[in-house]
Amino acid sequence: MKVTVVGAGAVGASCAEYIAIKNFASQVVILDIKDGFAEGKAMDLMQTASLNNFDTKIVGTTNDYSKTADSDICVITSGIPRKPGMTREELIGINAGIVKEVSAKLLEKSPNTIIIVVSNPMDTMTYLVHKTTGIQKNRIIGMGGALDSARFKYRLAEALDAPISDVDGMVIGGHSDKGMVPLISKATRNSIKVSNFLSAERLDKVREDTKVGGATLTKLLGTSAWYAPGAAVSSLVQSIACNHMKIFPCSALLDGEYGLHDLCIGVPVILGRNGIEKIIELDLDSADLNHLTESAEGVSKTNSLLGL
């Protein structure tokens, strides 16, 4: 199993590290345009192999796509990160050109690869890859919902004062502060609805804290977060590589599901060796369905900025 990560920044390096430590891939290639940067990250990570007990070979390269040939899975993290006060949508102009070029070069060397998009605005970048590459829709996946759901579960566990392993919850919708739809109505602690433990006011705070989770970290760090995004991506990669058939909320191209057409947005999917094996249609209450529809309108508006 060969995995390529494009972008040796904090998220890309974190992703490569988690994949290596989980020890399911034979090789991870890190590619970056900055001379020597990916090579340095790869060397540093390889020097942790004996300490972290993994056998994955990590290779770095400066913009040499021949090193990525025959990758089973490619992760695109390249692009400019958010700065404090920036929205994900403000990144669109620069990152669109980068993602379009990178996806084309990856497919030239690995025509059967599965692509996971991390670059922001993530739903629009995922849709851009669909529109510009023309490959099967099951082979293009946007990462956002898996990360947003992890942040949701963190906030739920915090509010419940419970072990995070007791908590289950999911975020669907767009990967943006306004577009996220944390499914409070379906969130549970050991299969018991969280509404049995928390007041409506407390649940509203959990919802809002989840939606601004990325912005909160950007303000604290001065740049985008990297540990949780890297972990989220590695979980998607592992489910695909090992055919685990796990369910994650991911940005997928919809064709009538949830009443939505021709856009990418976060919904629960089953991930296996073919990428998206199935899109799951949840039985949403009217409020959550309305929020998802509103989120889709926001994603479509962002798509239109690129003429998509």
Labelled PLM ranges:
Residues 1-3:
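Extreme N-terminal starter segment of soluble prokaryotic enzymes
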Residues 8-9:
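Glycine-rich Rossmann-fold phosphate-binding loop(s) that bind the pyrophosphate
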Residues 33-71, 300-307:
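Conserved N-terminal Rossmann-fold NAD(P) cofactor-binding segment
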